[in-house]
UniProtKB/Swiss-Prot annotation:
Its cofactor is Mg(2+). This is Anthranilate phosphoribosyltransferase. Anthranilate 2 binds at residue 166. Mg(2+) 1 binds at residues 92, 226. Pathway: Amino-acid biosynthesis; L-tryptophan biosynthesis; L-tryptophan from chorismate: step 2/5. One of its GO terms (cellular component) is cytosol. The lineage of its organism: Bacteria, Pseudomonadati, Pseudomonadota, Gammaproteobacteria, Legionellales. Belongs to the anthranilate phosphoribosyltransferase family. Mg(2+) 2 binds at residues 225-226. It comes from Legionella pneumophila subsp. pneumophila (strain Philadelphia 1 / ATCC 33152 / DSM 7513).
Amino acid sequence: MKPKLLFEQLLSRQDLSSDQMQEVIHACMTGEFSDVQIATFLALMRMKGETVNELTAAAQVMRQLAHKIDLGNPLIDIVGTGGDGRNTFNVSTACSFVVAAAGIKVAKHGNRSVSSRSGSADLLEQAGFILNLSDSQVQNCINQCQLAFLFAPHYHPAMQHARAARQQLGIRTLFNLLGPLINPAQVKRQVVGVFSTNWLKTIATVLANLGSERSLVISSQDGLDEISIAAKSEVVEYRDGNFKQWFISPEDYGLKHSSLDAIIVDSPEQSLHLIQSVLSGDSGPARDIVLLNSAAAIYCAKDGISFDAAIEEARIAIDSGKANLCFNKLRLLTQTLNKESNHE
C-alpha cells in the first residue's frame, strides 16, 4: 500500500482492512517504510483509534516475524501496555517473582523504556540480570526458577526498524498495544494492563482472536495500566469463550486506599529499590499494589481459585521469603549461564 494513499485514508478516519493492516505492518517491520513514514503512520493510527481487526492483523504479522521459543505450557505473562504517563515502579516485573514463587511458570515479555522512566529491561539490567540469553538458557531459567524474562529485541528483531520512530515520537503508539499481544513463548494465559478503560474489551477481544485461553485485561479509573491502590479498577475477563466485566478496589481485600505518590519513580534505580523492599517483606503501598496484581495473575493461571485465595497465595509467596529467593536465584542463574556461554 502506497504511503500517500495510506495516510489519506487514515486522515479521513477510515479503518484499515485486515489485509491492508498486515501489508503496512510488514512494510514497517522490513525497512520498506522510512522513519518519517512509520512515525506518520503511528501518529495517524493513534488519532483515528486502533480497531480490534487492525490490532489482530498487526499482531499476526508480528508473531509471524518473531523468533518463537517453546517453553511448554501452562505459562502466564503479566504485562502492561505502558503509555499511562504515571511513572510508577515496575509493578508487573515485581509481580513476576511473586507469581513464580507461588508455583506458576511465568514467561515475562519486556523491553527497555520507550515512553516511561523505567522499562522492565532497564530495571532488571540495573539489578544485574543478564537478559541476552539463548533459548536453552531461557528454558533453564523456567526449569530452575519458574520464571524467565524474554527480552523483546532478541525475539522481535524486526522491531528495530520502528525503534527510532517510536523514540522520536515519545508518545504511546500502536506498538504499546501490540507488545502484550506478541509474547514469543505463545502463552495462553495473560494479565494485561491497559492505560484506559476504553481499551479493555478491545484488547480482551484481540487476545481471544489470537488464541488466548484465559485473560484478564485491567485498567484503573485513575488511568493506571494495572490494578490501582488509589482508585477502583475495571477488569474484562475472558474465559471459556465468554467475556465478563468486574471491578476491584483495594478495600475489598483488606488493603488500604493509598495515594500513588509513594510508588512514583524517576529512574530504574528507584524502581529496583521499591521492588527489593516489597520482596523483603516491607509493608506499604508498594506491597499492596504488588499483592493485588500478583493475585490477578494467580487467579488467571489457576482454575477454580477465588481472588481472595489468590491474594493469600501472593502474601505467602512474599512473607515466606520465596519471592525474594526467586529474585536472587534467577539473577545469579542468568549471570552464571552468561559466564558459561562466554567460556565456550
